[in-house]
Amino acid sequence: MVYGVIFGANSYEHEISIVSAVVLKKVLKAQKKFIFCDKNKEFFLIDEEKMNAKTFSSGAYKKEKALVLKQGGFFIKTMLGEKKLDMDVAVNIVHGKDGEDGKIAALLDFYGIKYIGPRIEASVLSFNKALTKLYAQSVGVKTLDYKVLNLHKEQNVSLSFPCILKPARLGSSIGISIVKDESELKYAKDVAFEFDEDVVVEQFVSNIKEYNLAGCMIGEKMEFSIIEEPRKNEILDFEQKYLGFSESSKVSEANISEELKQKLRDNFTRIYNPLFKGALIRCDFFVIDDEVYLNEINPNPGSLANYLFEDFTNIVDNLAKNIELEKQIKIDYAFIHSINGQKGKL
């Protein structure tokens, strides 16, 4: 199995995606091709030996082979024309805009390329935090109370303090603020609106229990990772959140009851099946008074949440083997031929 790891793109989380790709170089024990999408949305084939931070920060990637996306795959530009890149399955690890909003999924679907990652509908619903909450509630998964603010509308925050403000279409803890009283609200709104015209406001619950669970469906069976309890802090900032997954070491499993473990898995399955088939996702949950609440869905989790799996490569291989392309629609122009036959040419 040869994987084409797609990363980068024009996103606030561009650099995080590069870190994810570098980690996958270490932990995915399979043949890999690294496909970098730069800020101008040009594709480059990066030699595995050059998969390091300097290649991208210095702009040296521009000296690598350029790729074009066409029906059936990526193609390398050569002096004699184009040569198809040897790749069986693409892996979408573009974080944020372009990768998690459905654009990459749409391209890969359109050009008939097998890929691991959320499909278009799953991307749209999980990229927008407000839509995520509506989706979760529709499948019987609880969420915290929330309100959506829009940059172009005058709206009051009806939730009591403290509350938390999050840009609706951004991950990685970027633009997030905890607001403890009215005096901090305007600044927090200004920060969040710098990144998105829609902002989700939630009640902030201190000393809350948080658990992370990753998984995917292989055939008709759900495969789950261990359950992680992140280290406690009011909120993980950008560096805390992503320096953690930049390491390839495993994490310890949360010390929780079998009953709670099953509750988390049940809620994960409701979120995942069938919308996220073909993707390996991570869900972050809150637990309050033994009740499970969805915090967020990570459709392309950092480094594919490899650190949560005992045998990460085996999970990815089995997921890839079960991915099917969309069925092609038969187009034979029978209708047009029938019109031409009866009434002359159109």
UniProtKB/Swiss-Prot annotation:
Q: Tell me where in this chain the ATP-grasp domain is found.
A: 133-324
Q: Where in the cell is it found?
A: Cytoplasm
Q: Which InterPro entries match?
A: ATP-grasp, ATP_grasp_subdomain_1, D-Ala_lig_Van_CS, D_ala_D_ala, Dala_Dala_lig_C, Dala_Dala_lig_N, PreATP-grasp_dom_sf
Q: How is the cofactor bound?
A: Binds 2 magnesium or manganese ions per subunit.
Q: What is its EC number?
A: 6.3.2.4
Annotated Mg(2+) 1 binding lies at D284, E296
Q: Could you tell me the Gene Ontology terms of the biological process aspect for this record?
A: cell wall organization; peptidoglycan biosynthetic process; regulation of cell shape
Sorted alphabetically, which keywords does the UniProt record give? ATP-binding, Cell shape, Cell wall biogenesis/degradation, Cytoplasm, Ligase, Magnesium, Manganese, Metal-binding, Nucleotide-binding, Peptidoglycan synthesis
Where is Mg(2+) 2 annotated to bind? E296, N298
Known pathway: Cell wall biogenesis; peptidoglycan biosynthesis
Where is it mostly found? cytoplasm
User: What are the record's GO terms for cellular component?
Assistant: cytoplasm
One GO MF term, please? D-alanine-D-alanine ligase activity
The disulfide bridges present are none
- Identify the PANTHER family for this entry: D-ALANINE--D-ALANINE LIGASE, D-ALANINE--D-ALANINE LIGASE B
What is the designated name of this protein? D-alanine--D-alanine ligase
Organism name: Campylobacter lari (strain RM2100 / D67 / ATCC BAA-1060)
- The gene that this protein is the product of is ddl
